[in-house]
């Protein structure tokens, strides 16, 4: 079940045992930082349908929010079984009218080019990895899986300790004992966060979306 930023912030405050020191705006900013960093390791896997017009082979991917990587392209969408097209440079002699696509401008928003000429009403199904959206209100759902929220909480905890550390550095204790303890805690908090990411990586299944299979020239069919 998707949970909201408000619910995540409540969890964070319980872990920090604090309802006063950091305003909501500060914790929200840390949540955004956590989502950006988490996307580097576990991007959001989602899909986008693109409506085609007659014989137009080029389409924008601007609706693919936070696009990082195109995983597969189905065209035309809706066939049973699904029909996937392969990526091939549009400069290839085989590209035009073939079951291919290319991404000549992969930088967001990006562009996708089909080898085949679509009909009006056809759709392109794009499965892609993208950044997790940054919530703009307390009631917007966090797209990170709930079982991965531990990493987000650890990231915010790390940032909270770092801020305490910086505050102590600006007004150091005469004995420097507090600063020393905070330094150790800050380093440990970062290690815990990185360790949690490695733990998730180790436990996540390797399985993912399957793209099209293309027979090698040496393969034989019996």
Named regions from a protein language model:
Residues 6, 47-48, 69, 86:
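Hydrophobic transmembrane signal anchors and adjacent membrane-proximal interface regions, especially
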């Amino acid at each position: 079940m998707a949970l909201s930023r408000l619910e995540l912030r409540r969890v964070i405050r319980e872990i920090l045992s604090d309802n006063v020191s950091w305003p909501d705006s500060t914790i929200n900013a840390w949540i955004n930082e956590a989502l950006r960093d988490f996307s580097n390791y576990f991007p959001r896997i989602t899909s986008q349908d693109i409506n085609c017009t007659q014989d137009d082979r080029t389409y924008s991917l601007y609706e693919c929010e936070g696009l990082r990587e195109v995983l597969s392209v189905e065209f035309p969408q809706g066939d049973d079984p699904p029909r996937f097209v392969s990526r091939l440079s549009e400069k290839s002699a085989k590209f035009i009218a073939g079951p291919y696509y290319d991404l000549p401008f992969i930088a967001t928003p990006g562009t996708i080019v089909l080898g085949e000429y679509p009909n009006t009403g056809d759709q392109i199904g794009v499965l892609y990895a993208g950044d997790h959206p940054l919530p703009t209100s307390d009631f917007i759902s966090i797209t990170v899986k709930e079982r991965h929220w531990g990493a987000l909480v650890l990231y915010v905890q790390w940032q909270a300790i770092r801020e305490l550390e910086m505050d102590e550095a600006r007004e150091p204790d005469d004995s420097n004992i507090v600063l020393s303890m905070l330094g150790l805690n800050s380093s440990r908090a970062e290690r815990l966060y990185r360790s949690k990411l490695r733990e998730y990586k180790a436990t996540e299944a390797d399985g993912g979306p399957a793209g099209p299979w293309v027979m090698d020239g040496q393969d034989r069919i019996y």
